Amino acid sequence: METLQGRKPKKPHYIPRPPGKPFKYQCFQCPFTCNIKSHLFNHMKYNLCKNSISLVSQRMEQTGKASRASQHSPAFSHNSKELPLDAESTKPIENVKIEKAVTKEAREKPQSPIKEVSKDDTEPALEAKDKSEDMDIAQNKISSAFSPVARTCESEALSLSPHKDDQSTIPHFYQQIAPWVTSASSAHLLPPIPEYPPYMVPERSLPPLYAPYPHNQASTPAYQVTPRETQRPLVPSPLIPPNSSLLHPYHYRYGHSIFPSPPLPYSFYQHPELSIPLQRSRYLPLDVYSSRFYPREYGGHLVPLTHPESYSRLAEDRAVQEHNTGDKGIRESPLEGCDASGSPDRPSTADVTQRIPVGLRLASHGESHSGSQSHIISGSTKANDNLPKMPCGQNQEKMLQKTERYDSQTTISSRSSDISDKEEDEETEEEIGPLNLSKRDQATSNNMTHHHYPDRELHYDSESSQEEAPLNLCLRVQSSNQALPNTSETPEKETISNAEVSTTESPQDLEPCDQRQTAAFALCQLASSRDIINDTSVKQQDVTESQNTKCLPSPDNCSVKDSPNILNASMVALGQKRANNRPLRHTNKRAKVKEPSRPRRKRSQNC
C-alpha cells in the first residue's frame, strides 16, 4: 500500500496543493486554483463550492453508500495522492495520538491472550471512531474535482445537517402535531393608537386568524370558509369620532355604523348642489368643431360657418360661393375671388387693399340689382319715377336735379361715339373677338337702355360730380358713399348708357370735367381683360331674351359676374393713364386691343 501511495498519479486537471503546506481557504479542490486567492475567488464568485456541498449531501442521502477506504489506511483517490493527507489533517489531534500509541504497542510488545483481549477491546472503539470519521469524510467527498475539504467544525455541522433535514422534510403546515405550537407566541399586532381598537379584536374563545391552531383543531383546514355567527362585516372606525371628547366612552369590539342610514338606491346619483342636470346631449355642438373648417358644398347646398371671423377672407368667399352655386361652369380662384392672377403663396397688393369694400359691395349690389330688375318687369318709361333705392341712403332730390340737368345736355362727340358703338357691335357680332358687345335686338336694347341704364348712369354721375376733382383710380380703401355706387353695374353698360342717353334726350354738350372722367373710366374698364367683355355680352343676351320671353334672369348669375369685374377693374386701374376723349377708344379698339392689354395687366400686378 505504501507503493501505491508513493507512486505519482497522472497529471490531474487541477493543480493540487503542495503536500506539506496547509490550506488556507474553504474550498481547496477547485479546477482553477492551487493556493492562490485570485484563482480561488473566481470559483467562489459563482457559488460553486456551495453547489458542490449540497450535491454531495443529497447524493449520500439517496445512495447511502459508505466509503471503501480501509480502517487503518485512508482511502486513495485517483485524482491526487494528497487527498489522504487532507483527510488526516482534518482528524482531531487526540485521535491521531491514540492511533500512534496503539500501533507502537502492537508492533513492539509480544502477543499474549491478555493483551489480545485488551487489544480487542480497544479496537472496536477505534473502529467506531474511524467509521464515523470515514462517513463524515465520504459524505463530503466525490470523485469530481468539486469535492470540498472542510474543517473539523464544518464537517461536524455537515454531518449533523442531514439528520436535521430528515426531521423537517414534511412541511409544518401539514403536520398533525406541530412541534412549534407550544413555543409559538400568541402576541397580536398592537394598534398604532392605543385608545382606538383595531378593526377586529378577537375573543379568547375564537382562534386568532394569524396564530397556529391548537392540537385539537389540527385536522381543520387552514382557511375557514363558512363564517361564524359572531363574525360581522368589518367597518373601519372613523379617525375622528363625532363625540366632543377624543376618547370613546366605550370600545367597539366590532366596527358598527354610527349613523344608521337606508341603503343607497342603485340609480344615477344627482348631486343636490348641481342645478344643471348631468344627463346632457350625447353630441357636442357644432361650434366646437366648425371654427377651423372651410365652408364647403355638399350636393349644391352650402354649409355655412358658425365662426367666420377666424379667417379674414371667409366672409367674401362665402358670398361669392353663394352666388356661384347656380352655375358650376364659371369658377374663380377661391382666395382671390376674381381670377388667378395672384401667386398661391403670397397675396397680391390689390387683394389686400380691396378686402373690406368687396364684402360691402357684394351686399349692396344684391339690393341694387334686385331693384333694377323690378324696373324691367314694370316696363315703365319714366326714369324719374323708377329711381332705385340707393344702398347708401342718398336723397332722391339730388337725383331729380341731376336728371333735369342731363336732359338739357348732349354732345356731338357722344353722338359719334354712339354711332361707332353700333358699327363696332355689328362687326364683333360676326366674329368672336375679345370685345364682344353685340346686341341682337336693337329696339329692345334701346328700350331697355331708356328704362334701365339711365338710372345707373345718373347714379354714377351724381357721385362723380359731388367732388369736382380728377378721377381717383387708386386702390385704397374708399368710403362707403364712394365705393358702393361704382359697382352697381358693369362699366360697359355705364359707357353705353352715357352715349345713348346723351343722343336721345338733349342736344347740348357735357361739361369737360364729366366728359374726361367718364371717358377715362370707360377706357380703363374696357381694356381690363377679355373675361369682362365675355361676361357682359352673355349678360346682355340674357337680359334681352328674358324681356322677350318674360322670364327673369337668376340674380345669382348677375351678382357673381359683377364681382370679378369690379376687382379686375380696380386691379388694372393701377397702371392706367387717362385718355382725353372718347374717339381714341374706338380707334384703339378696331386695331385689336389684345396686345396692349397684356403689358397693362402685368404692370398692375407689380404696382
From Swiss-Prot:
Keywords, sorted A to Z: Activator, Differentiation, Metal-binding, Nucleus, Transcription, Transcription regulation, Zinc, Zinc-finger
GO CC field: nucleus
Compositionally biased intervals (Basic and acidic residues): 79-133, 318-334, 452-462
Composition bias, Polar residues: 60-78, 496-507
Localization terms from the record: Nucleus
ZnF CCHC-type span: 25-51
One Pfam assignment: zf-C2H2_7
InterPro entries according to UniProt: ZNF750, ZNF750_Znf
Name the record gives this protein: Zinc finger protein 750
Keyword Nucleus (UniProt): yes
Residue numbers spanned by region Disordered: 60-133, 318-467, 482-511, 575-607
Functional description taken from the UniProt entry: Transcription factor involved in epidermis differentiation.
Native species: Danio rerio (Zebrafish)
Gene it is expressed from: znf750
Binding-site residues for Zn(2+), renumbered to this chain: C27, C30, H43, C49
Origin superkingdom: Eukaryota
